[in-house]
Amino acid sequence: MTKPKDCLHLSYVCMSATNETMRPSYILDRIRRIFPDKKELQGQRMENRIVTNKSGLEVLIIGIRELLEGNHSHEKETLQLYKLYLKHGDARTLERMKQAMQYQNLPEKLAEQVTQLIRLQDMAMSVSKLEQYASCAYAFFLRYILRLEERQIHGIDNRNVGMILHGAMEQMFCYVRDQKDNAWETLSEQERDAKTEEFVNENFAKEYAGQELDAGQYEVLRKSLIRIGKRTVQKLQAMMDASYKPRYFEYAFRKKLQVGDEQLSLVGVVDRGDLYVNEAEQTISLRVIDYKSGAHEFDLGDLYEGLELQLAIYTDVMRELVDQEWNKNRAETERYKIVTDSMYYYHMQDPYVQAENETEAEEARERQLTYKGLARDDAEEFDTVLAYAEYKASALVTQMKSGVIDKNPMRESNKTACDYCAYKDVCRFDEKYGNNRYHYTKHSAKEKEQLLEEMHSVCHGQKNRNR
């Protein structure tokens, strides 16, 4: 880069041979900062790309595709090139090109008979399945309707890790509730760590029962999970509010959801529900915690698109449960007011950090080990989020029951639903030639006020229609 005397041209590809978006080198960002006034040109002039007969055909294909998409910026050059190939006796090639241009990689809606079968087999739907449908309807179709699965390989993956840690947390919190009357302050560090290790070992043995694993790999993973388990329980104990008491653990639910003339059951498991009972004010405050073995944050933009429904729906389910358990058979004047105070994700981890000493390392870990979610700073805002989650779930089920299985993977910034999809070879999603399109997220989480306003408008309109 330092050798040119007169001019330096920098270029980069935007798309790989398999039509996947490619990010440019980090060097280009540095160059842009050094020369902020320099303009970036998008590609070569059309005529400069025509070098051989083959490259000319490629340029012609791009030009015709632009015309089909309503882009007439190269119309004159494309028509001239078409006439040139037609004149030189390439009519057969042009006919094949024309047929190829009509190719569309678009699935049709499912027939009514098929959707009737779906209604029979899927009257119970997990919230995670709805999120998958919102992420990409076609991937949902392949996985849950056709039931295509990757070859099962016995081994270790994130699902195993999640099951082990979830099971250990459930046992630990039940132990403190049943044996210590929820008095976490009476639990010594030695007893806490010993019980955590015991519960992790129990769940580890249960999860991998009957499987042959490499002894070394097995032991490294087991010790790692014990370390994560101890760190998680230690942190959750430290964050324990004196007012709130953990009451519900791994609560499996079935929530009725009205979809048109049909009823569907939403199913799921709530990791933890904490209660604060204020007898003087006759109120019960609810806090819902959902454990995650991977990094996860609550995002209003994702909730709006249907990608983030779990936490809000789980919180609404727990609100109904608490109301039923505490207010059943009570007179109207004696009923508790149920207040949903907050809903959080907690990432179960023992993060590696860079620091000068152990004190700084511990402080860095503390900053990462926090609840992430939504607190009830504004009652109307919180209730809008819960109401919108139920509305969006109903809307997704309605779309699903009508047979829509579009290849519409969600795209947000540089992330797409296709990035880790197991069905790429079946789907063959292709923006360039298959007429496939990404579904871009409408709002980012930063547009909080606009998001809440639209959610409120949608929910308010739905209530008026149901009257």
What are these regions (language model features)?
Residues M1-K3:
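Conserved helicase C-terminal RecA-like lobe
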Residues H9-S11, A17-G43, V51, S55, ...:
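RecB-family 4Fe-4S metal-dependent nuclease core
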